């Protein structure tokens, strides 16, 4: 089992946050 460093956790959280923002923006434009 590989140990996950704090840096990888931060990168994963930031990338997930960006994906959520892009998806919400795309959803708003599609619904309008």
Swiss-Prot record:
The keyword Transmembrane applies. Keywords: Chloroplast, Membrane, Photosynthesis, Photosystem I, Plastid, Thylakoid, Transmembrane, Transmembrane helix. It is found in: Plastid, Chloroplast thylakoid membrane. The chain crosses the membrane at residues 3-23. Coiled coil: none annotated. GO terms for biological process: photosynthesis. It is a single-pass membrane protein. The keyword Transmembrane applies. InterPro entries: PSI_PsaM (IPR010010), PSI_PsaM_sf (IPR037279). Pfam families: PsaM. One of its GO terms (cellular component) is photosystem I. Belongs to the PsaM family. This is Photosystem I reaction center subunit XII. It comes from Anthoceros angustus (Hornwort). The lineage of its organism: Eukaryota, Viridiplantae, Streptophyta, Embryophyta, Anthocerotophyta.
């Amino acid at each position: 089992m590989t140990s996950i460093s704090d840096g990888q956790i931060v990168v994963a959280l930031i990338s997930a946050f960006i994906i959520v923002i892009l998806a919400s923006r795309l959803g708003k434009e599609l619904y309008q």
